[in-house]
Structures are given as C-alpha cells and as structure tokens.
Amino acid sequence: MRNNVETSTVGEILFEEFMKPNNISAYKLAKEINVPISSIQDIIHNRSKITVDISLRLARFFGVSDKYFLDMQNDIIIRNSKKGVNEINDIEEI
C-alpha cells in the first residue's frame, strides 16, 4: 500500500528544522548571511528555489555540508516530479 504523504518544501524544512529551533527570524538570517530578506522569505514560502550562492551561505551559517540544502531541494524536486507521472514507469531500461 502506497502512502501519499505530502512532501515538505525546502523552505518548510529550513524554517522548521533550522530557523525555528535556533529562534532565528527571516530578517536575522538574511542579515547574518548577507542576502536580501525577500530571498529568505521567498524560499520559506516556496516562491523561489535555493541558489548555489544561498546554499553555500546557509551551509556555512548552520554548519552543514556545502551541498546540504541543494541536495535536499533536488531530492524534493525529484520525488515531486515522480508523483503522478505514470509514463516514467513505462520507460524501459536499455
């Protein structure tokens, strides 16, 4: 039986797993990593994706690997792309 649980966005994970436990607002995070607050707000609200530059800044600030946020974002994109795309299942490996 397949469970269709909604996949979190990278912005939700950034907020819930990194910002909230450390009591960091979007304003404070933007100031600390030297990016516009709108960039952080857009990521949190799923209006934009994490760029390489922002990923590197977030990684440095939160003490994770350089690719952590980009890898997470790409994993989420792949999982969401697979949902409901039956034609992918019809492709045969060579």
Language model features with spans:
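Short alpha-helical DNA-recognition segment
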Residues: 23-42
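Residue-level recognition of specific faces of alpha-helices
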Residues: 39-42, 60, 68-71
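Short, charged recognition helix plus adjacent turn
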Residues: 70-94
